[in-house]
Amino acid sequence: MNAYVASVIDYVKTTHANQPEFVQTVEEVLSSVSPIMDAHPEYEKVDLLKRMVEPERMFTFRVCWMDDKGEYHTNRGWRCQFNGAIGPYKGGLRFQKNVYEGIIKFLGFEQTFKNSLTGLPMGGAKGGSDFDPAGKSDAEVMRFCQSFMTALYRYIGPDIDVPAGDMGVGGREIGYLYGQYRRLKGVWENGVLTGKGMSYGGSLIRPEATGYGAVYYLQEVLKHENDTIEGKRLAISGYGNVGWGIMKKAAELGAKVTYFAGPDGYIHDPDGVVGEKLDFILEMRAKDPMHCKPYADKYGVEFVPGEKCWGVKDVDVYMPAATQNDVRMESAEKIAASGVKYYIEVANMPTTNDALNYLRAQKHMIVAPSKAVNAGGVGVSGLEMSQNSERLVWTAEEVDAQLHKMMKNIHKVSAEAAEEYGLGYDLVAGANIAGFKKVAQAMYEQGVF
């Protein structure tokens, strides 16, 4: 490893020791970029890596709100504007009780390179709160969102920082956030947020975009291996917007999700989640997002409580699509032993570093990284920004075609970057290198500040 790269990784481990998720993603990305640093000693002269691992700015604020009983609560909010070298800051908002500064920074750092891979002019950012919308009334969520935006609005804008949804932040929350932004600013700037409803400037297929893009990326991997998606059986974790998008697009292209996992266990449906079953997934999730067992009850298929589907052998592709560090070493060993060839990360950093390195070392496996695979979500957010700027609404077919083109290009540039540096078909390193190169050169050309 390049000595400068190693020193920056050590620096992050020392100065951010209480933020393990952030340390993990920095180590995962920087461990791939030694060839670039060897080829560009000028980057070390301006201390580019140490600047890159520190956010440009980080806002922390209190969010006070009143529940339906008239009792007051205070949560913490964050917005991390990590890197704006290639465009306005762009990244989602996560409302989840386990959110803290380290998770926001990890997501913002990862977002920087993901956005770079899309080819669109978007910098990296992330934000959120330790507020949990689950179990809250619509009125309580509205009051929280209004308070959150009151603290945030002065730091964002269509050409400054454009938040979007993430875990715990869907169309309802985006609507409340935009309503408060408009109330405070007194202007119509619907490009300030993405993931909006169609009635006020949203984009078609945005909720499904991450899942659709993941399947398009898988399709490119299969093409590279002279294989086809037709008939492929997929095992996924999660059945939210991302998981549902995977199910729907896989079915359209002739594949099927035969295993999917939720918080309470996993489902095995040999016939796949297709047809009207896709509609039932939406109904089930809306009623109770914590339990997938009702699917087994309705369709008479197998439900395994309290377990994940990692290690099942009668599938062709694994796609972790739930949350970070879902797949640890024990699960990775089961996955490798199953003989399955394709491991396609979809959630942000769903695999621990030791598990990821273990899977990458398996000669029979191809591993694709989340920052490339799930970039379709933010890619379509970027397309929503374009539509807002043009005062136009594109058809679903137009958006889907642009998404498909984008995912093909992300796979192409990742594979080419790996090949350029003698790494074969290493998509993990290739995505890190391809995303890093653009950001690094932009930072270098803009000087030290």
Predicted regions and their residues:
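Adenosine-phosphate binding glycine-rich loop
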Residues: 2-25, 221-222, 336-449
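Glycine/serine-rich phosphate-binding loop and adjoining beta1-alpha1 elements at the start
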Residues: 96, 115-230
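Phosphate-interaction motifs
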Residues: 61-122, 126, 130
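Flexible, glycine/charged-enriched surface loops at secondary-structure junctions
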Residues: 20-23, 39-46, 119, 156-165, ...
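Rossmann-like adenosine-cofactor binding region
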Residues: 265-367, 372
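Glycine-rich phosphate/diphosphate-binding loop of Rossmann-like nucleotide-binding domains
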Residues: 202-312
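Structured beta-strand/loop patches that form or line metal/cofactor-binding pockets in enzymes
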Residues: 42-71
